[in-house]
Amino acid sequence: MSKLLSYTARIILRNSRTTVRQLGQEGVRGFAGFVSGQRNAPQPAYGRPVPGLLRQKMVSSIGKRSMFIQTQDTPNPDSLKFLPGVEVLGKGNTYDFPSGTAAHCSPLAKLLFRVEGVRAVFFGSDFITISKEESAEWSLIKPEVFAVIMDFFASGLPILHEARPNADTEILDDDDETVMMIKELLDTRIRPTVQEDGGDIVFISYENGVVKLKMQGSCSSCPSSIVTLKNGVQNMLQFYIPEVESVEQVFDDVDRMADKEFERFEKNLKQKEPAGAPVGIGGGPN
């Protein structure tokens, strides 16, 4: 009797093990089928697999837009320095575009002037300085400038079609010793410092002890440009070149137009002020 019970127990145990094993295998197969079904099932719109061609286009687009562009403030609140992380014009070279009409020799400058609010463009060795209209907001301009710079460098087009940067300080056959020394100092001592602030100084002429220079980039409309010119540039030139008596800033037609507009704005502002209004430290009403 005990042997029969033992034999019956072994059969029941064997059958139960088989059942558990089968259930386990079926469970695994069922789970695998569920996962497979989920993979093949239609996905919601936000999670749908990207078609092959579209995926290739996206990868290509991401590759083109992998440039990391940094920005750097300048002494001029209306000018911002963009550093794309690649060479722009090369070491020591600069090119100024005070207006859109001057951008005929640069495809990149033309595109940047299409951004609403951009007033001037300046290329340096490894940076691009954008000067905006006073009423424009950087929060609106910066994203568009980023996109233009990234797309342009991905295209492989030349930055300049013609004209040589820094032709103003090239030593000419008819330059006398004083002019040669002025150009040398500008290139080696003065320009590198000014270019760090997103601007440049261009040599115009030297006559009767007077050096005439033009400010470009962020320096062209910077409130402290006159101080920089007199206290910095003039002092250095006079220290090394005794023949230099003074330094004067030269303005082009675009600069003169901007100054006239500012003077007109100030005049209109004063006319709108009530008579006898108290004047504050800055010259405006308290």
Curated annotation (Swiss-Prot):
Residues 267-286 are annotated as: Disordered. It comes from the Eukaryota. [4Fe-4S] cluster binds at residues 219, 222. Residues 1-15 form a transit peptide. Belongs to the NifU family. It is found in: Mitochondrion. GO terms for molecular function: iron ion binding; iron-sulfur cluster binding. Keywords: Iron, Iron-sulfur, Metal-binding, Mitochondrion, Transit peptide. InterPro entries: FSCA_dom_sf (IPR034904), Nfu/NifU_N (IPR014824), Nfu/NifU_N_sf (IPR036498), NIF_FeS_clus_asmbl_NifU_C (IPR001075). Residues 182-250 are annotated as: NifU. The lineage of its organism: Eukaryota, Metazoa, Ecdysozoa, Arthropoda, Hexapoda. It comes from Drosophila pseudoobscura pseudoobscura. PANTHER family: IRON-SULFUR CLUSTER SCAFFOLD PROTEIN NFU-RELATED, NFU1 IRON-SULFUR CLUSTER SCAFFOLD HOMOLOG, MITOCHONDRIAL. This is NFU1 iron-sulfur cluster scaffold homolog, mitochondrial.
